[in-house]
UniProtKB/Swiss-Prot annotation:
Motif residue range(s): Cell attachment site: 51-53
Protein name: Disintegrin molossin
Organism: Crotalus molossus molossus
Record keywords, A-Z: Cell adhesion impairing toxin, Disulfide bond, Hemostasis impairing toxin, Platelet aggregation inhibiting toxin, Secreted, Toxin
Subunit field text: Monomer (disintegrin).
Stored InterPro entries: Disintegrin_CS, Disintegrin_dom, Disintegrin_dom_sf
Keyword Cell division (UniProt): no
Amino acid sequence: EAGIECDCGSPENPCCDAATCKLRPGAQCADGLCCDQCRFIKKGKICRRARGDNPDDRCTGQSADCPRNRFHA
């Protein structure tokens, strides 16, 4: 939905204001495999292990989402 930055279901979430569904001041993210303590995880950190010989998925440092590498189906 427009204007919603985070899931405001839990008032205990330190990253998200439950009343406005907006990130709290200073927060970059509220959840996601590449979000830790309201901040994006640094670029290159493994967020999803690959199977077989494919490379692991790694955080970009610019998003809370863990991008799928091009080798994953």
